[in-house]
Every structure is written in structure tokens, then in C-alpha cells.
Amino acid sequence: MISSADSGRDAAWLDDFLALTLAGGTPPAHAGECAAHAVRWRWLGDGLLQFEPVDATRRMQSVLVSAGVHGDETAPIELLSMLVRDIAHGALPLRCRLLVALGNPGAMRAGERYLDDDLNRLFGGRHAPLATSREAPRAAQLEAAASAFFATAGRARGARWHIDMHTAIRASVFEQFALLPHTGEPPTRTMFEWLGEARIAAVLLHTAKGSTFSHFTAQTCGALACTLELGKVMPFGANDLSRFARADAAVRNLVSGRRDAARAALPRVFTVVDQITKQSDALELFVEKDVPNFTPFAQGTLLARDGDYRYAVRHAQERIVFPNPSVKPGLRAGLLVVETTLDTHAALA
């Protein structure tokens, strides 16, 4: 049996998981107990940490919470490190199996979005051809960790969750919004109610399979998965974490088996209808450099030109999300969405 003294000494680094990760350090032990021996933990590698109640059962939910897939999106990383601390001290009771993932430690240490390639476009095996990319082995490691974690999870609807937390490069009409991956199944009321609890203002529904971490866990691991965009990119230590309080509380409620007593309104919904794809470095994007996400444009408005390629708004109104002319040729330079709130809410499963 692990003594209290040994357990406390070996787990002291859990007070600042972020500091250990930024230092590229290794904990003195790779497994142990915390929270007065109520929780088992395992360090699975750089930025990867698994918790499990000592009395865990197969009926428990399995929850993956990730942040730092983009290394400069610091606020969710800081929140996740504090979540680890509070679980370790027993301040936050754990009522699920939990995998914590700091997505791109190399980019976090460099203070960059990524080192060679956007990690959140390398999942679903898209990392395989990129032999020289420093992100490619990390994508493979995250896929393997998620697959192993969910392999022993329950299979009931809602038994598997993945919350991938980000912040955005630009401002947004809706400061905090979520993206749901396309799986071929209708969105669930369970997820929408949780997003409402997190006070997420809008949800973007993808209509094609993608290459993000949440797409991978939804499609391959059968998780209820979402990507959260929680505000603006800021350096470590410069975040006003109070702005993320509702989302943080919702994550904490999820892992501790609690629910917000106040029934929140469901978020508005926007569905992807098209995208602007960068054909070449000659791409011209006819929107202001700092245009907020979800800015609306009227039918007929020319938004992009790239050689013979043109994109003009086809619907009565379309909103642009993630406009970025600086991506590599062949990648998405912007998404176009239309509002589908009423139809989506009516069809929730």
C-alpha cells in the first residue's frame, strides 16, 4: 500500500501540472493516489494525465478534457491545470474516469500556435504523410491515448465525452461558441443542454467529416464531443479567467457528476453551408483583417477571389467564421454558415 507521505511527495507536482509540462519535466512517480487516497492517477507522457476514482465502475462516464492543441491558447490550459490541482486535493470530487490532455506542449513552450503544422488538422490519420512535422507524432500520440482511454469506457449513450477547449485568434459576434463534429447522427439534447449550462451562446454544426481532435473522438471513439471557443488568445498569466467561469463550472460539474440547478437556454445554431478553400498564395479575402467571427454578409457579396475561383454569398445571409488567408494552399480559409436554430432544436435526439 502507498503510504500517505510517499503518496503526497510523489503527487506534489499535481499542484501545478502546467509548470511541470512547460518545463518538459517528468514526475518522480508515474502513478499514485491523491485526494486522500480517493483517486488514482497515472502520468501517461508529456501533458497527458489520467484520473480514476478508486471505486470506479464500468457504469461511470469517461471524460476527456483537452486544451492547448494550439499552444498559444492559454486560458483553457490554465483552467485545466487548476482542475487537476483541485481534483488532487479533493476540493473537486471526481465521479468519472478522466483523461486530461495538454495538446501541444512543444508549441506551448514556444508560445506559438504550432511549430510546423496546425495540430488540429492532423487527426484521423492525416498526420501520417508528414514525416518531418513535429506535430505529426503528437497527433498520433493523442489519437492513441484517446483510443486506449475510451476502449474500456461504457457504451451507453452519453457514457463518453470529449471537451476540447480553445480560444480564438479574432473577436466574435458570439464571444463563446462551440463546434460540433459531423458524425452522421443528429446532435443530442444532452450535449446542447450541457452547452447551455456552460452559457455557450452559439453552436456551429459541421456537415462534413473533419480532421480535428473532437472529430476524431466523436467518429472513432464514439464520444459526445465538442470544440469550445472561449474568447481571445492571450499570453500565459494575462488571462482574465473570470470571463470563462461558466464554461469552467460546467466542465467541473461534468467531471464531478453535478448539474447546474438553473435551466439555461439552449444556444443558437448555425450550420456550415460552404467554405473558402485557398487555391494559391494569390488568394484575396474581401473582408476586414479583424472582422469578427459570425459577421453576416448579404446575398451576392463577393468574399474571396483566387485565380479563376470566386466565392459569393448564395443565401439571403451567410456568416463567416475563421477567415484566415494565411493558411497553406489547399486548406480552409474560412467557413460560411447560416442560422438553423429552430430546425436543429426541434430535431434534437
From Swiss-Prot:
InterPro entries, per database record: AspA/AstE_fam, AstE_AspA_cat, Aste_AspA_hybrid_dom, SuccinylGlu_desuccinylase
Cofactor note: Binds 1 zinc ion per subunit.
Active-site residue list: 229
The enzyme's E.C. designation: 3.5.1.96
Pathway: Amino-acid degradation; L-arginine degradation via AST pathway; L-glutamate and succinate from L-arginine: step 5/5
GO molecular function, one term: hydrolase activity, acting on ester bonds
UniProt cofactor(s): Zn(2+)
Keyword Zinc assigned: yes
Keyword Hydrolase (UniProt): yes
Keywords: Arginine metabolism, Hydrolase, Metal-binding, Zinc
Binding, Zn(2+): 70, 73, 166
GO BP, sorted A to Z: arginine catabolic process to glutamate; arginine catabolic process to succinate
Annotated catalysed reactions: N-succinyl-L-glutamate + H2O = L-glutamate + succinate
SUPFAM superfamilies in the record: Zn-dependent exopeptidases (SSF53187)
Function: Transforms N(2)-succinylglutamate into succinate and glutamate.
Sequence similarity: Belongs to the AspA/AstE family. Succinylglutamate desuccinylase subfamily.
Protein name: Succinylglutamate desuccinylase
